[in-house]
Each structure stands twice: as structure tokens, then as C-alpha cells.
Curated annotation (Swiss-Prot):
The keyword Mitochondrion does not apply. GO terms for cellular component: fungal-type vacuole membrane; phagophore assembly site membrane; phosphatidylinositol 3-kinase complex, class III, type I; vacuole-isolation membrane contact site. Keywords: Autophagy, Coiled coil, Membrane, Protein transport, Transport, Vacuole. Residues 87-153 form a coiled coil. It comes from the Eukaryota. It is found in: Preautophagosomal structure membrane; Vacuole membrane. Coiled-Coils at the N-terminal half are essential for autophagy. Residues 5-20 are annotated as: Cysteine repeats. The gene is ATG14. This is Autophagy-related protein 14. It is a peripheral membrane protein. It comes from Vanderwaltozyma polyspora (strain ATCC 22028 / DSM 70294 / BCRC 21397 / CBS 2163 / NBRC 10782 / NRRL Y-8283 / UCD 57-17). Pfam families: ATG14. Belongs to the ATG14 family.
Length: 337
């Protein structure tokens, strides 16, 4: 049975029924043979293609046929790989160029902002802001002047309260609450109790004075409050602390150079009492400048050597008599008029 086109009447395909196929094997046998031959050709072609691909991909190729197809395919695949790499490199290069441009733009922006920061001054500020700044500056200067005047008045009140005086006397040129201000030259001439009392008042004065000028002291003189001063060496350490406090206040008030000073020359010219008085009354002092870093131990050594105290001394030097005073360490009535 054949299929016929109803338009052109052309026989396109034959069709057999199941009965004919089962009863006539010769009809199906040629078709089966053709199918087997096609399958065999497909296997051969498949093996050939695999060999060509194996050769093209640099695998072990052992085909006995002509390898022209493999060489051509390998060349094409190599070109394809080169094109892929080129495309990928171009994409990366383009991305790098874009990032480079962004970085350059950001650098230019950064430079422009820095230039604006460095070139911005009061002239670029608006008139309202300039007026506000001037008002704040004026108020600050006024408050600063008020604070300075109040500090000066309080300092003068403190001087009057402690009765800090300068006397026309060589041995005792300065007094504080009617007690002689301790110096290196009158140290051995005053009773020990008077020396300790004088140092106690001087530390009290400096503590209140530092609070007025808002300057913290390095040393407070707590040894006097605890009454643990027994030897001249301990008194010398107390004088060292006093000298350091006075020097720090003098530097804070710009009365003494802030560079490394010649402390030996300064104490020789002014001594402790004159140094104390000049700093309190705001007298500027000239001083030699040296390349030397002063520490507590070095200042203590200068004070000890000036007082001519032996190192590690545990005893007190005998006191000399000054005026009508008595040579007693427990004399608390060494009052100067």
C-alpha cells in the first residue's frame, strides 16, 4: 500500500500493514540492513570526529588517517581561544581605564578641596559670619581682661593677707606673715622650727596662688603637714620642691625664659627668697640659657651643694644667732617686724 498525494497524485511513501510485514519478511529486511549500515557509518564518523578533536585539543592522537582536518580544527580552536583571551583582556583593560579615570577624578576633587581649605580665609566668609566672629572675639577679649583683672586683685589680696613684704635688710630681705622667707644664705642662721614654719607658709601661699591663676603645682609640701621633717637634708628636699614650683609658675607667667636656664647662676643672683618675691609681684627676671635638662635630682644636688650639706646627712647643722633670736630649734617666735 502506498500513500498518494491528493493534489499532485505523487507517490511519496509506502506503507505496509502488520499482516504483510509478518507474512512477508523480505519487505522489512532491506530497511533493517539500511539502518544497520547507517549506524555503522555514524560510529565511524563519531570515532573520526573524536580523533580530530583529540588532536586539536593536544591529546594523544593515534589516527592513521590524514590529520589535515585535525590541524585545521586545532588552528581554528587556537584562534578561537586567542579571540576569547583578547576579548577578556579588552574587557579587563576597559575596566582598568574606567577605574583609572575615577581615581583621577577623585584625586582632582581632593586637590580642589584641599586648595579650598588652604585658601579659605576670613575674606571668603560672609558678612554675617564675619560680624559674628568679631563679636565672639570681642567678648572673649573682654572676658579675658576681666579674668586677668580679677586674678590680679585676688593675687594682691593674697599678698596682703599673707603680708608679703620686702624689707631693707641684708640678712632677711623678705617676710611672709612676719616670718623670714627662707633663702639659701639664711638657712643656717634660722632655727629649724622657724625654717619649717616659713616653708609651710610659703607652700600654703603657692597652693592658693596656683588656684587663682589656674596652674597646677608639681609639689604640695605634704611633709610639713604630716610633721615628718627632722633633718637638714629633708628641709633641703623641701626647698628643692619649692624652687621647682616657683620656676614653673615663673615660666607660666613668662617671667622666666622657658628654655633650659642656668639654675646655679639664677640662685646665685636672686636666691630662693628673691626668686619667690619677684615671681609673685610679676617682676621679669633675666637668666642665662644653657643646654641642660634639669631634673629633681639635679636641682636637689644644686640646693644641697649650695647649703654645703654632706650627702646622706641625718643630723642638723648648728644654727647661728640672727639679731636678738635664740639658737634653739623649737623657737617658734622668730617674728620679724
Amino acid at each position: 500500500m502506498t500513500i498518494q498525494c491528493s493534489v499532485c497524485r505523487n507517490h511519496v511513501q509506502s506503507m505496509y500493514c502488520a499482516h504483510c510485514i509478518n507474512t512477508s519478511p523480505n519487505l522489512l529486511h532491506p530497511l533493517r540492513m539500511q539502518l544497520l549500515m547507517v549506524q555503522q557509518k555514524n560510529k565511524v564518523l563519531k570515532g573520526k570526529v573524536e580523533d580530530i578533536l583529540s588532536h586539536a585539543l593536544d591529546k594523544n592522537w593515534k589516527s592513521s588517517d590524514n590529520d589535515t582536518e585535525g590541524i585545521i580544527l586545532a588552528d581554528r580552536l587556537h584562534k578561537l581561544e586567542v579571540l576569547k583571551r583578547t576579548k577578556r583582556n579588552n574587557r579587563v583593560r576597559y575596566r582598568i581605564s574606567q577605574l583609572t579615570k575615577r581615581i583621577e577624578n577623585k584625586q582632582q576633587r581632593l586637590q580642589s578641596l584641599r586648595l579650598q581649605i588652604t585658601t579659605t580665609d576670613v575674606a571668603k566668609v560672609s558678612n554675617a559670619n564675619k560680624k559674628e566672629i568679631e563679636e565672639i572675639r570681642t567678648k572673649y577679649l573682654q572676658l579675658n581682661e576681666v579674668v586677668k583683672r580679677e586674678q590680679e586683685l585676688e593675687c594682691q589680696s593674697l599678698v596682703d593677707w599673707f603680708i608679703l613684704r620686702k624689707r631693707n635688710s641684708y640678712e632677711i630681705p623678705y617676710t611672709l606673715v612676719f616670718l623670714p622667707v627662707v633663702s639659701l644664705k639664711n638657712f643656717h642662721k634660722l632655727p629649724k622650727a622657724v625654717t619649717i614654719s616659713s616653708l609651710h607658709k610659703m607652700f600654703q601661699f603657692l597652693e592658693i596662688y596656683s588656684q587663682i591663676i589656674s596652674f597646677p603645682l608639681l609639689y604640695k609640701g605634704d611633709e610639713i603637714k604630716e610633721k615628718t621633717i627632722n633633718t637638714d637634708e629633708e628641709i633641703a628636699k623641701l626647698i628643692t620642691k619649692l624652687v621647682i614650683n616657683v620656676l614653673q609658675i615663673g615660666r607660666f607667667k613668662n617671667l622666666i625664659p622657658k628654655d633650659a636656664i642656668d639654675l646655679v647662676w639664677l640662685l646665685d643672683q636672686y636666691d630662693v627668697d628673691s626668686l619667690f618675691y619677684n615671681v609673685i609681684v610679676n617682676h621679669k627676671m633675666e637668666c642665662r640659657v644653657v643646654l641642660f635638662h634639669w631634673t629633681f635630682g639635679k636641682v636637689s644636688k644644686v640646693v644641697t651643694e649650695t647649703l654645703q650639706l654632706p650627702a646622706g646627712s641625718t643630723t642638723s647643722f648648728p644654727r647661728q644667732q640672727v639679731g636678738d633670736t635664740y639658737d634653739k630649734d623649737d623657737d617658734m617666735w622668730h617674728i620679724v617686724g
